[in-house]
Amino acid sequence: MGNCCSHGRDSDDNKEEPRPENGGGGVGAAEASVRASKHPPASPPPATKQGPIGPVLGRPMEDVKSSYTLGKELGRGQFGVTHLCTQKATGLQFACKTIAKRKLVNKEDIEDVRREVQIMHHLTGQPNIVELKGAYEDKHSVHLVMELCAGGELFDRIIAKGHYSERAAASLLRTIVQIIHTCHSMGVIHRDLKPENFLLLSKDENSPLKATDFGLSVFYKPGEVFKDIVGSAYYIAPEVLRRKYGPEADIWSIGVMLYILLCGVPPFWAESENGIFNAILSGQVDFSSDPWPVISPQAKDLVRKMLNSDPKQRLTAAQVLNHPWIKEDGEAPDVPLDNAVMSRLKQFKAMNNFKKVALRVIAGCLSEEEIMGLKEMFKGMDTDNSGTITLEELRQGLAKQGTRLSEYEVQQLMEAADADGNGTIDYGEFIAATMHINRLDREEHLYSAFQHFDKDNSGYITTEELEQALREFGMNDGRDIKEIISEVDGDNDGRINYEEFVAMMRKGNPDPNPKKRRELSFK
């Protein structure tokens, strides 16, 4: 899709990013809201002169310093340096990772950066995944602006506490597996899961946990096999070493993390990397040394099932979440959470047609990197390559993602996404229905959508203009246009101005920075 709204925003991230606040090197981040984040006043964004196209992000170059003030260095890694940065418009603080383009020495390096941007855009909005705020490219560097994880690494917090219970370990694991269940249901394999890639949003006792560093992550389709050996030695699954693997490799890595959480040492250890790999391939896990004799049988059962050398016999993320040990404190659900795409479809169903048309316009303005993940999901569901998804294809596609729905629920979702009511979901309808609602926080997207309706550039959307737009998209459902206008028209002048339009678009959307996220407690 085109770049008509792409405002030098999107983003990218890279392998081995510097770790904020604890000197490490992962795609650190998580927005430490220095002030409460309320929506800024709705006013059309100023027109900006576009620069030349950047070779890495493939869109106009832009100076990150026009929107952010860069501060102290937070960390340094192989590919980049991370600085604290402050958004000029709001005063909010973020992390800005700068990648020198001279370090991207070949086509593969550039593709890795682009893919990471696409994946982070695809996952942005999930509560326990670091959020990408934007990416900028100038002559010398690519700059990634993301949430600031000021709380440091998860394991550092555990070590500082000095002790924790199996119940606390189960709570941590539940959050980590829920994150990966979301990734897998959205067609992403992380491929580099390790303790260093889980950061805390803040230094608060109950700070949310954030998954970071998607530099090695890939999009995948069910049944797809990967062959390249990537990851960190202690956490690599045996099938990765054998160059034939899929999403099951992530579960192995989390199983290694659980083993370490329970006993303090990795299950496969040696003096050299090759020695570690040989130990992994042998598959022998020690459950006899201290403290394993006093660890509960249920915990050991889960570790064994996550570290099964046969990926076909290994538990899936959904099965891990249903294991008795993880559910012991009663907080874990009986079934995995609905996958993110299904939740978005449900939300889309509740929107009025005016808002749905606006979302179609915004979907057409998103950059390729913002919708790449959804594009792949659409292609995966469109099994006959017709360019549309039928009811049966939607049913099968949701089932492959691990979502169990009744026939009625599938039909309801079909009706929600099929905006023009022709019995199938086309590409534009799918993107509009499933793109994350945080796209509505971007002023340039909202303004472009408003301009689409405001044909005469009067600054208002009239009854005639709204009727024309609904007809254009085949979405005039018989409701009186004046009734729709009256729902949105705050000052009762019979037309809709930009501020009223923005209020309608944001009404009923989830808070992009909810205070109540999944919380951790170390007891």
From Swiss-Prot:
**Quick one: where is this thing mainly located?**
membrane
The UniProt annotation puts the region (Autoinhibitory domain) at 332-362
Q: Where is the lipid attached (N-myristoyl glycine)?
A: G2
Q: Residues that bind Ca(2+) 2, according to the entry?
A: D418, D420, N422, T424, E429
Q: Where is the EF-hand domain?
A: 369-404, 405-440, 441-476, 480-511
EC numbers: 2.7.11.1
- Annotated active site: D192 (proton acceptor)
Q: Where is this region: Disordered?
A: 1-60
Binding residues for Ca(2+) 3: D454, D456, S458, Y460, E465
Protein name, please? Calcium-dependent protein kinase 34
Gene of this entry: CPK34
